[in-house]
Structure formats: structure tokens, C-alpha cells
Amino acid sequence: IPEGSRAITGISCAYLVEHMERDNEGFSQMGSEGATWVGESVFSNTDHVFQNMGDGTYIHSGILSIRHAVAAKTKMTFKILYNDAVALTGGQALDGLPTVAQMSKQLEAEGVEEIAIITDEIEKYSDRGGFAKNSKVYDRKNIIDVQIELSKINGTTVIIYDQTCAAEKRRRRKKGILEEPKKKIFINKDLCEGCGDCGIQSNCVSIAPVETEYGRKRQIDQSSCNKDYTCVDGFCPSFVSLEGDIRLKKNYDDNLINKINSKIDDPKLPQINKSFGIMIAGI
């Protein structure tokens, strides 16, 4: 968010920012996003806040909290992450498969003052048919400027941030239902000075430390890289881009894997004549 601004977290992915030193504070249950500020705003010297919300929450009950803010004429901006997956429950598609254009029309009908659509694929919005009249599309690099402009508007405004969940992209690429980008990014350890600016710019977990005789440097973990490429926004000459059908070498020995597997006994299955419960970690 812009320097000096304040934001409120949501649930699920929107809550993760609570622990990331991003000037986000407070949270609520699903469907009550923004309600705390609606009440607080009339007693506060703060002029405006941002409220985070996921697309799954929006479909479930979040639209009601936006309606509440509009009815109360509250000056705030809802930031809706349209990441094309209900991450809280396992990455399912949104109920009803609403498009960004449809959401913008719904928000316009609810009385939202202005809608900004921010995306990493701005070329797919060359046709603006079906979008709300009070909506505009921006490249994600302009997100700070857009937030500053919306914070000046009296009333309730909305940002729809359209970018598919990185984990979901990797799943779809492995399944062959999403094209695998031909470009891979690497870091030349001989040039890297370990400043970490690539991590600051991208906030990406695929930038991993690597210890060298000259100290700690950085490398790109290709197994988790989601091909976002924002790491190259870092102020650094060490990045190397390779394009084409690149095959990475295995970092393990097939014979070793087979040797380990040969020593693993088959599981002993219980004789079941009633219900049997198994606890599995994760969602």
C-alpha cells in the first residue's frame, strides 16, 4: 500500500499479510470485511483505509460488506484478489465462474464510486465490452499510483486485482491445461552480490539463498518458480534469461531412489468392519 496508508486484512490468503510488516492490521470473519472501519471511521482522524478481500469471500458474502460500506457512505477502498481459485478450501473454481467484467458490473450496480482493474496480463483486456462504465484497467506496475488516486475519492471504491494463484498455475502446467512459458530465469552467482533486492521487488519464495566461498548469494529454485519474472525488477546485473525448450538436469540418482524404494515394506492394511478414520495434514 502507499506510504502512510493503512489497510485491514481479510481471511485466507488475505490474512497472510498480517505477518509481513505491510501496515495491515485487524481482521474479521468472512463477510464482515470493512465493517470495523465503517464503525470506526466516524470517530477517527484517519481519512481512508484499504480493506483486503479474496474472490472466494466476495462470492460467499463479501459483496454484502461492500454494500454495507456503500450504504454508510464510507470512504474506503476494497482490494479484491481475483486469483481464480478458492485457496482456503483447496483451489476450487469460484462458484458460478464469475468473470472480472461481471464483478465490475455488479459492483457498479451496488453503487461503488470507481472500480480499478489491475492485472499482470493487460493485453487480455483490449476488448472492454461488458465492463462497468466506471471501471478502468491498469498494469500491475501502476498499483501504488492507482491506490493513491482511489484514496482521494469520497465514497467506496474497489480494486479488482486479477492474477491467477501461483500455486494453481503450477498445478495446471503440470496437468498440461496451462501452457508452460518458454523462458526461465537464472542468477549468475559470480555476479550476484547477495543484496536481496530481487526478493524485495518480487516477494517470491523461489529466490533461495546459496552459500559460496564469497558469502551468501541468491539462486532461483526452478522447482517452485511460477514464471512471474518480477524478480528481474531487482536492481541487479546478475540475471540470465534462457528461452526455448530447456530441460533441467536431475539433482538425484534414479538408482538411489529405486534402492530406497526396495527397502520400504508394503503397508499393512487393517481389517475393517466399521468406520476407519485417517488424519492427513493439510487442507
Feature names for model-found ranges:
Residues I1-E3:
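Active-site pocket-lining segments that scaffold enzyme catalytic pockets across diverse folds
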Residues S12, L81-D84, D120-E123, Q163-T164, ...:
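Short, ordered loop/turn segments at secondary-structure junctions
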Residues L256-G277:
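A short, basic/flexible loop-to-alpha-helix module at the beginning of a structural domain
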Residues R6-L88, L94-A101, D145, I278, ...:
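Thiamine diphosphate
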Residues A85-I177:
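Glycine-rich ThDP/TPP pyrophosphate-binding loop and its adjacent helix/strand module
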Residues L16-H19, H60-G62, A87-G90, L97, ...:
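Short helix/loop capping segments that flank catalytic or ligand/cofactor-binding pockets
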Residues Q163-T164, K169-K175, E193-N251:
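Iron-sulfur cluster-binding cysteine motifs and their immediate structural context
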Residues R22-E25, A85-V100, D127-S135, I177-D190, ...:
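Short beta-alpha connecting loops at secondary-structure transitions
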